[in-house]
């Protein structure tokens, strides 16, 4: 008996069949439709699908019709979908004010009627959350540090490190190795202290002008797009702030940038992705 293995085309067809949904609606966000004269949105979404609003008593879901969920191993395709998803949420923000953003690839079956029931089932929660986020936005703050200037001058300010380096220069090979190790340990200790100090200073500076703040994970060192200097991510914050406080927030970040070797990357305003509750699943 011949073992029939599916061709790539057959495998793709099978995968698509497994991901088919019945009268699906892809959700981008939930909005307060009372904040706009018209509960409509003129834009296209993922895969150029027309986007529209399904409304239930002043609360609307921004959706498009879909027949499959959006899953692929093609990372570039996923990135394109994510960018489009964000663009639709941005358009909804412009039209209706701060939305409650949904996760990428959130799909409900059952057509517009199921969306209306979903909105009605979670109506009180949606109304409360939309009211609480009205006029506030999420901002992302990333503190980067080039430690080279610090390493070049810290011995002038730290007696212990200066002593170790002086003894190292005056010692023989065996002793010199141990002193070099101690010197490096002291330098690393001082750098850890400086990282903590910078993060604390940033948090202290921005806290008075934000409504909420959460620390996010940092990755390994970033390469600056305009420089060969490798900068370390010290801390990343997501903050929730009133739109009127954006300038004040930026001014406070400027005081942190004055420190040598420090760079702040400040982005926003974003919908409250980090702070919006996972309601209405």
Swiss-Prot record:
A Pfam family annotated for this UniProt entry: GvpL_GvpF
Membrane-spanning ranges: none
Cellular-component GO terms for this entry: cytoplasm; gas vesicle
Compartments it resides in: Gas vesicle; Cytoplasm
GO terms for biological process, alphabetical: gas vesicle organization
Induction / repression: Probably part of a gvpF1-gvpG1-gvpH1-gvpI1-gvpJ1-gvpK1-gvpL1-gvpM1 operon, maximally expressed in early to mid log phase. Gas vesicles appear earlier when grown in static culture, possibly due to O(2)-limitation.
Main location: other
Cited InterPro entries: Gas_vesic_GvpL, GvpL/GvpF
Family of this protein: Belongs to the gas vesicle GvpF/GvpL family.
Note: Encoded in a 14-gene plasmid locus called p-vac which produces predominantly short, spindle-shaped gas vesicles during all stages of growth.
Function: Proteins GvpF to GvpM might be involved in nucleating gas vesicle formation. A minor component of the gas vesicle. This the only minor gas vesicle protein that binds all the others (including GvpC1, GvpN1 and GvpO1, but not GvpA1), suggesting it might be able to assemble them. Gas vesicles are hollow, gas filled proteinaceous nanostructures found in several microbial planktonic microorganisms. They allow positioning of halobacteria at the optimal depth for growth in the poorly aerated, shallow brine pools of their habitat.
PANTHER family the record matches: PROTEIN GVPL 2
UniProt protein name: Gas vesicle protein L1
